[in-house]
A protein has these predicted regions:
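A short Gly-Trp-Pro
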Residues: 27-28, 32, 38-41, 45-81, ...
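N-terminal export signals
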Residues: 1-12
């Protein structure tokens, strides 16, 4: 992993505030435009409304067991949103089977909708992927993906909500 990848951040933050700029999408995948919103931080509410596994993964940086969630091998056209805040994250057009047992994508739907931070847990350096709007842990990005980006956004299925295109 290059240092540039490890420190890259796509979140457009307004200086001195807790505002972030994201690209909004309709449920049929059409870009609605950029908007600036307050970052969502309501951990007590997350615990009440998420399943125990979704809370552990998204709020406590957990990882679901590979091949354990039904969404890992979904192939129909659609949009993947954050299970916590509904932010649009990935278009199914960029999803591919990485053989890992987790949903994998070669790019986010809009670079500003996710951000990446260095993750040094478990004695290794990786790049964690989070939702820009609510800071939910989504998974990690690796440099072993397919063209055109060479990236593998390896996401936890429980962190994503799939909306099929109509």
């Amino acid at each position: 992993m290059t240092m540039a990848l490890a420190t890259r951040s796509f979140a457009a933050q307004t200086s001195g505030s807790d505002k972030v700029a994201i690209m909004q999408y309709s449920d049929d995948g059409k870009a609605l435009g950029r908007t600036t919103l307050s970052r969502v931080r309501k951990d007590a509410e997350w615990k009440a409304r998420l399943s125990p596994l979704a809370y552990e993964v998204t709020r406590e940086q957990g990882t679901e067991q590979a091949f354990s969630q039904p969404g890992y091998n979904r192939h129909e056209p659609g949009l993947y949103r954050c299970v916590c805040c509904d932010n649009a994250l990935f278009d199914a057009k960029t999803k591919y089977d990485s053989g890992t047992g987790w949903p994998s994508f070669w790019q986010p739907i809009a670079p500003e909708n996710v951000h990446e931070i260095s993750d040094h847990l478990f004695g290794m350096t990786r790049t964690e992927v989070r939702c820009t709007l609510c800071e939910a842990h989504l998974g990690h990005v690796f440099n072993d993906g397919p063209k055109p980006t060479g990236l593998r956004y390896c996401m936890n299925a429980v962190a994503l909500r799939f909306i099929a295109y109509k």
